[in-house]
């Protein structure tokens, strides 16, 4: 499992540069680069900042990493992935829209 590959995957899905992710996660561009390339470990604090930047949980980042191969490709087709892995891949605005839709559907069931 390589957290760096998952971070790169998520960053690219958001259309962000390493500098943008560094700004969002309160670290330097070189730290992001080193993390993505496996040249640096990660602290709980940086994982929390990254999760906040990606609007997800730390566990979702780990789950995504577990479902990636050594080249950073997803191992399974989307129909067999855990819902968290699918959700985290979506742009943040789509995640927000889906959350709103889900909460609306739940409220109508009450």
UniProtKB/Swiss-Prot annotation:
| DNA-binding region(s) in UniProt | 18-37
- GO molecular function annotations of the record: DNA binding
Q: What happens when the gene is disrupted?
A: Deletion of the gene results in a 100-fold reduction in transformation.
Q: Which domain of life is it from?
A: Bacteria
Name the keywords, alphabetized: DNA-binding, Repressor, Transcription, Transcription regulation
What the entry lists under Pfam families is as follows:
HTH_3
- SUPFAM superfamilies reported in the protein's UniProt record: lambda repressor-like DNA-binding domains
Per the database record, which ranges form the HTH cro/C1-type domain?
7-61
Record-linked InterPro entries = Cro/C1-type_HTH (IPR001387), Lambda_DNA-bd_dom_sf (IPR010982)
- Physiological role: Represses transcription of the PilB-specific inhibitory protein CpiA.
Name of the featured protein: Competence pilus inhibition repressor
Species name: Acinetobacter baylyi (strain ATCC 33305 / BD413 / ADP1)
Q: Lineage of the native species?
A: Bacteria, Pseudomonadati, Pseudomonadota, Gammaproteobacteria, Moraxellales
What's the gene?
Answer: cpiR
